[in-house]
């Protein structure tokens, strides 16, 4: 196979990896930083931090590639995705597969600089990243798999720091799954009508008229679990204030999705970046005694 790395091809790879849309990487980054700050506590080693930040961006890019590869026959039928690089022909299937392999190999080379437990956990991370895009064909709960995939950096972070995965690790992992199901349901509400027509499954379709209620319950669960983590680790008031601010952001999201309008649902999804940021700032302030 010969690659013609013209400017147009590089731009197509750029779009395929979603490096022009950082929201997905940020939603993966914040829980990773939560885990590193709790595990250390508050002062992660610079190399470990660098490996995980780079890994977040690389694996998110790889996840986007495999997601579009899995959906290549569906995306052409959805208005929002019809012009993506694979359905439009800007990137071939062989090129997409090769790009995925390159991104995964670079990520794995970074992980090899960490301890054995983290390396072993990274195998599960790869499996989750590969499996998730295909789940929407077989189950209405692909968002749960997404949450596990996006949250697997949490046990990896704890393992990298202490070679252990304590209770706080798994509570944070569960909180991330609940959060991911909530925000990705908001995202799926944007495409719900198109997904029904082409046979794609999602929690937005499964929850139906109860979507807003269930999202709200999931968001309350996130806040409760994060509060328990704070109690287990003796975190200060700065952290609990961040939980209150995150709760206010969740209320704002409920207001946005009230009428289930596409643009408003997408705006609610995007707002979750601030939830992750606020919780991270709360952790940082607590550990750094601001």
UniProtKB/Swiss-Prot annotation:
It is a multi-pass membrane protein. Disruption phenotype: Mutant is unable to convert 4-hydroxybenzoate into 3-octaprenyl-4-hydroxybenzoate and is ubiquinone-deficient. One of its GO terms (biological process) is ubiquinone biosynthetic process. Pathway: Cofactor biosynthesis; ubiquinone biosynthesis. InterPro entries: HB_polyprenyltransferase-like, Prenyltransferase, UbiA_prenyltransferase, UbiA_prenylTrfase_CS, UbiA_sf. Catalyzes the prenylation of para-hydroxybenzoate (PHB) with an all-trans polyprenyl group. Mediates the second step in the final reaction sequence of ubiquinone-8 (UQ-8) biosynthesis, which is the condensation of the polyisoprenoid side chain with PHB, generating the first membrane-bound Q intermediate 3-octaprenyl-4-hydroxybenzoate. Geranyldiphosphate (GPP), all-trans-farnesyldiphosphate (FPP) and all-trans-solanesyldiphosphate (SPP) are also accepted as side chain precursors. The sdgG mutation, which suppresses a conditional mutation in dnaG (DNA primase), has been localized to one of the ubiA, ubiC or yjbI genes. This is 4-hydroxybenzoate octaprenyltransferase. It comes from Escherichia coli (strain K12). The gene is ubiA.
């Amino acid at each position: 196979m010969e690659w013609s790395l013209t400017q147009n091809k590089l731009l197509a790879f750029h779009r395929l990896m979603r490096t022009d849309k950082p929201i997905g990487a940020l939603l993966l980054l914040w829980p990773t930083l939560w885990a590193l700050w709790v595990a250390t506590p508050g002062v992660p080693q610079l190399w470990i931090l660098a490996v995980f930040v780079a890994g977040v961006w690389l694996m998110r890019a790889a996840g986007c590639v495999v997601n579009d590869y899995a959906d290549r026959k569906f995306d052409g039928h959805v208005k929002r995705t019809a012009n993506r690089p694979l359905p439009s022909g800007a990137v071939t299937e062989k090129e997409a597969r090769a790009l995925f392999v390159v991104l995964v190999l670079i990520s794995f080379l970074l992980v090899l600089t960490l301890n054995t437990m983290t390396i072993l956990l990274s195998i599960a991370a790869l499996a989750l990243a590969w499996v998730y895009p295909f789940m929407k064909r077989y189950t209405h709960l692909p968002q749960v798999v997404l949450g596990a995939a996006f949250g697997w950096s949490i046990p990896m972070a704890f393992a990298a720091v202490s070679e252990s995965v304590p209770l706080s690790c798994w509570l944070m992992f569960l909180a991330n799954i609940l959060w991911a199901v909530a925000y990705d349901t908001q995202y799926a509400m944007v495409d719900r009508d198109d997904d029904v027509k082409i046979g794609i499954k999602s929690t937005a379709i499964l929850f139906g008229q109860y979507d807003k209620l269930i999202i709200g319950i999931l968001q309350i669960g996130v806040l409760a679990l994060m509060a328990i983590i704070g109690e287990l680790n003796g975190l200060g008031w700065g952290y609990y204030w961040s939980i209150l601010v995150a709760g206010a952001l969740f209320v704002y999201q409920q207001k946005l999705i009230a009428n289930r309008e596409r643009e408003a649902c997408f705006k609610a999804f995007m707002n979750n970046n601030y939830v992750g940021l606020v919780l991270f700032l709360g952790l940082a302030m607590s550990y750094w005694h601001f």
